[in-house]
Amino acid sequence: MENVSTPAVFNLSDLSVEMNSSSRQWSYSEYSEAVAVLLGILMALLVMCIVFGNVLVITAIVRFQRLQTVTNMFITSLACADLVMGLLVVPFGACYILLNTWHFGSFLCEFWTAADVLCVTASIETLCVIALDRYLAITSPLRYPSLLTKRKACVVVVTVWGVAALISFLPIHMKWWVSDEPEALSCLEDAHCCDFNTNAAYAVASSVVSFYIPLAVMAFVYGRVFQEARKQLEKIRGSEGRFHAQMIDNNQGQDGGDGSGGGGGNGKRPKFCLKEHKALKTLGIIMGTFTLCWLPFFVLNVVVTIWKVDNIKMPFRILNWIGYANSAFNPLIYCRSPEFRYAFQEILCLRGAAFPTNGYIYRGHSLRLSPKDKPGSLSNNVGTVELGSLSSVTNINGYCNNPPLASIV
């Protein structure tokens, strides 16, 4: 970067940069040895959890056909963003903190910073897409399979990553973020400094575009999804009540217990419908966890541009790493899904070849009736059963016709 200052200022600036660079090069840690070791262990564990968990999620979706649904394509995109965070962003960030200096050059510094912004932006945009996907599934259940096919989902995923890359890499490569503060300019000239000292305009604009606008869209759409889900649940309960009352009236003049069989079938209907609402809760946990992890950082990122606050480096660092930790949480949340749990167990060889559940045996890519079930005992009521599948839903006697809300049930 060219310096347009006067010669005297130029010399002082060069001297300052040289001294700062020398001090950074030889000052390997700002923490004591014990604290540095503890931080290193914690950061290494976080990296391993992020990488292991998200590789497990991606492997499960790729390997098991029943997990290869439209919404799970978006889940794969989210896992890829978390995986990049664990492989690239977090390890370099850990080295920078522990060594208190940057050893990887200016190009990797910019690339690392842009990758950080890329992963966060791609994650929240993907969560927005998932919310829109669920809104279409619950409001237009019959048209949903044609509205969002796997091919269209691929286009959406590529678009999300393209927009995220444009938002992250272009401004950083063009140096639109550089602050005119002396400390920021000094760091920019120092090959051993990789602090992201942004100007106020970039800090506000990037926070709004990369976080606040997608967050508002996600919250609004997901609120509408919950409203629609509540309406459907009320309709289902009303239908169940009328059906139960009709069965009682029909059985009053009959001898024997013919109505008991109907009651048993009636008791099964809400389970499939409640399963969809459990899927909504799971998606809500994913979105809520992401918001709780990253919202404090982005609030502080905007606040410090309005009010100058001293000694803000440590709070920034803590909140930033809370955001990083979010990448390790999603695989744990997916364990709410029976199919994901079974897939994880099979990948990790934690169970036998067959795992019976609810009268079904889950073998690789197929679900089969277990021997204890009578032939045809479920075939009369159940069309195609996909535990937690996104692409279709079991329909029992006309109830709960909309497609399931997520495979992460």
Swiss-Prot record:
The keyword DNA-binding does not apply. The lineage of its organism: Eukaryota, Metazoa, Chordata, Craniata, Vertebrata. Keywords: Cell membrane, Disulfide bond, G-protein coupled receptor, Glycoprotein, Lipoprotein, Membrane, Palmitate, Receptor, Transducer, Transmembrane, Transmembrane helix. It is a multi-pass membrane protein. Beta-adrenergic receptors mediate the catecholamine-induced activation of adenylate cyclase through the action of G proteins. The beta-2-adrenergic receptor binds epinephrine with an approximately 30-fold greater affinity than it does norepinephrine. It is found in: Cell membrane. It comes from the Eukaryota. Residues 1-37, 99-109, 178-199, 307-318 are extracellular. A lipid is attached at C349 (S-palmitoyl cysteine). PANTHER family: ADRENERGIC RECEPTOR-RELATED G-PROTEIN COUPLED RECEPTOR (PTHR24248), BETA-2 ADRENERGIC RECEPTOR (PTHR24248:SF21). This is Beta-2 adrenergic receptor. Residues 62-74, 133-153, 224-282, 338-409 are cytoplasmic. Glycans are attached at N3, N11, N20. GO terms for molecular function: beta2-adrenergic receptor activity; norepinephrine binding.
